[in-house]
Amino acid sequence: MIAVASGGLFLVAWILSPKHGRLAHLIRRFRLRLQIATDDLLAVIYRREESGRLLMNHGENIVISSSLLSWLTKKRAVSKGWLDSSVLDSESRLQLTPKGREMAQSIVRGHRLWESFLHRDFQLAQDHLHEPAEIAEHFLGPDLQRELSERLDTPGTDPHGQSIP
């Protein structure tokens, strides 16, 4: 009986521990996933605006499909003041606010700086630059971006010829 009670207490602690429990781990992973999805949404809208297109194409709509994560992503972006809430129901017409454009610009800047860094310092081919930059862009804050920019002598364009904001 004591072994069963001890096992039960261990199981409860293993699941509910605020720092190392499974539930806390799942919550942290979901928050990170939501942050990355929000960053991706802002970057897609920024790139669309940068190219002068008003509507998203089918490939871009995949990023903001009708899943729960997508809905939470848009809600989070609106609550942070990054997306214009008046067009929230129209996925093809999502618009950044000035604050959202600044955030998206930072994400795209990090992406393009990382591509430039990989191309220059590791001599990676252009077709091998996008995926690592797609991951790194979510973790490159202003300090790292500034350091990368200085290290790269403030490049104006990335290896693909896109301007670095």
Which role fits each region the language model picked out?
Residues S51-P165:
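Structured cytosolic domains appended to multi-pass membrane proteins
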